[in-house]
Amino acid sequence: MNFNSQGQAERTYDAIVIGSGISGGYAAMELCKKGYKVLMLERGRMVKHGEYPTANLDTWDLEFQNKVPREEIANHYYKQNRLSWWVNQDNKHWIVKDDEFDYDEKQRFDWIRGHHVGGRSIMWGRHCYRLSDLDFEANMKDGIAVDWPIRYADIEPWYTYVEKFVGVQGKREGLAHLPDGEFLPPFDLNCAEDHFKQAVEKAFPERTITPGRTANLTKYIPELHHGTRGQCQARDRCWRGCPYGGYFSSLSSTIPVANDTGNLTLMANSIVHSLIFDDATQRATGVRVIDAETKEEREYFSTVVFCNASTIGSTAILLNSKSERFPEGLGNDSGELGHNMMDHHYGMGGFASFDGMLDKYYSGRKPNGGFYIPRFRNIDEATRRTDYIRGFGYQGGLARVTNVNAPIGPGFKEAISSPGEWQFNATCFGELLPYHDNKMMLSDTETDQYGIPKLVFDAGLKENETKLRADGVACLEEMMDAAGFKNLKTYNNPTAVGAAIHEMGTARMGRDPKTSVLNQWNQVHAVPNVFVTDGSFMTSSGTQNPSITYMAMTARAVDYMDKELKRESTI
């Protein structure tokens, strides 16, 4: 490849941020606010806030009643649609086509992506839960993998800092293992969900049911919620993009704030091939980029580089950044780069019906799913299991669902005008341990259309996850039974790493450069001007949705970098 570095001065910035999603947007905003000239590189197409073509369409406005034809799925979304609920007419424009961006897998691996400005921050589930020292101390206490190089006290103020800007609605519960945050008023449980809460907490005092905590503005505070934000309309169409800015995304929040500083340059359709490494200084000096439309090759330069291209994207870039100093990928002295792939495993849960409270209903379509049940196994000695370590949590809710069996006519009209009985559903999310042999690699023989090595995945669940899943399903069944629900059904289906869309851990943090890629400040051990603050850095997965942790760690890393540069560090 012949990368064009002519006009280097015009292509030099204080910082380069790779990726425009949850963590990339936050990195760019924090850097720009501190006065740094920032180049943000996004491999996908340009999208601006408000450019959400299906946001205000109803199901009957969408082609094929929101379904995607089987032929189209078979031709373009054969891996993306292995999550059978995922690819629809209202969101397929956010989803990559497998025939254009394929990958190999030694075990089934579900890599769900969106190539566009804003990334998956447009499509995310928005649940925001803090990690705790139960998570940060877990590897050390269990004697597996490596110890996190931080504790909750190190990140606690950054959770607070980020939550105020993001806008997280929720209810304080006082749980040490699921710390409370800076919450906006919650979307309260509806009457049937509250019945479930009361019944379960009476039968199982160690279990807590709380409204799901999500990044939706139940109260818009202009002094805090900068960008193009507005109060959540409770439409529950967030995955299409929200023209009101009711939920947090890079497009509605961090990118507009960064742009307002005058310090941001955003380039879409810019695929980062690799980082440029200078043997003389032992620092990264910039990035090599391929234009997604013209395939032109060029270089950009900076003092620092933030890798926020997603766990898989950033790890692939680092693995492909080979030099005499780093023949196996930039910063890969430990040999851990690409290993320890984690996700949350699901595909387990339950359904039921509830024939009480038929005289009650609810208003709006709250976008938080309903309730969250935080982990209650292996919290302390009283909840210790001997057959597996770690735990699981649940997300679910109750709603009145009308199932119409009447023929077309007056009976049909009456039936669809009346609410049906309450239907319960809940999904269990389990922790996946950081196994060294769960990994991603670069192909030695195949490249994509841009000449970049194709990715190969080899990751799966093991015995601990199998035992955990069985208990998660059994616990859900006993909770449904305690609530007096009828027609109980549980499931524990085969699943794959990646299916929860929380992939993480392939450039983990640690205390020792011999066993980890990053230090406690998200710096590559051997290349301290390269920071990785997307999910790659995770040392264990916990059971909580991870995005708020990515943002908190990103803000913390930028603050550290800024202070180091201002004291003329050798960063």
Please describe what each predicted stretch is.
Residues 2-139, 144, 149-160, 313, ...:
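N-terminal glycine-rich phosphate/pyrophosphate-binding loop and immediately adjacent elements
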Residues 91-120, 124-125, 130, 143, ...:
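FAD cofactor-binding and catalytic pocket of flavoenzymes
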Residues 210-218, 232-238, 268, 273-280, ...:
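A glycine-rich dinucleotide-binding beta-alpha-beta segment and adjacent secondary-structure elements
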Residues 25, 35, 224, 229-230, ...:
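Aromatic-residue-lined binding/catalytic grooves and analogous aromatic/hydrophobic interfacial grooves
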Residues 64-110, 115-116, 124-130, 135, ...:
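Conserved redox-cofactor binding core of oxidoreductases
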Residues 540-558:
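A conserved FAD-binding loop/helix module that cradles the flavin
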Residues 33, 37, 42-63, 244, ...:
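Glycine-rich loop(s) and the adjacent beta-strand/alpha-helix scaffold that form part
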